[in-house]
Amino acid sequence: MEHIFLNLKRFDIPSSLGGVNSIAPPAKWAEYIISSVKGELAAMSADAEFTIFFPEAHIIEAAAAGKEGWLLGCQGVHRFDVAPGGNFGAFTTGRTAKSMAALGCDYTIIGHCEERRDLGEIISEGGGTDLNAVNRILNQEVLRAREAGLK
């Protein structure tokens, strides 16, 4: 079976704000994407597994559209997660793997170039020089994703 991944990055930002979106209002963007491709994806589903990775603002809308012929992916997860008797979930700006799984995600992206660059810049800004720390942090994300059942 083939695996096809579509990462939509931040293509939802309207062109009037400097983005590239001219196809639908941001609140209806995921719905537009899915309605535009789901017929073709259903026809291909016997030969290929197709995953669409949406920006976090569109995960709920995408999951609600119904995953017929496609899987849902998020664009990253935090290196820590909630646990019974542990952290109760105060991850204000972080997407935990369990939260993404609970919303219906099947896959996540870990270690894309923007994330690697951002982590490296944070380490350097703090005076650090061990950029292998980026790989160690990303490994924590991989572990959290697997624990949550994400691929």
Model-derived regions, located:
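Active-site glycine- and acidic-residue-rich loops that bind
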Residues: E49-F53, D81-V82, G89, G127-R136
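Short amphipathic alpha-helices and their capping/turn segments at secondary-structure boundaries
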Residues: I60-A64, R95-L103, E141-A145
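Receiver (REC) domain switch/active-site residues of two-component response regulators
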Residues: D106
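Conserved anion-binding
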Residues: E114-K151
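Conserved, mostly hydrophobic/aromatic
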Residues: P55, M100, H112
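Short, acidic/polar
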Residues: P25-E31, F88-A102
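Conserved N-terminal beta1-alpha1 strand-loop-helix module at the mouth
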Residues: M1-C74, R79-G85
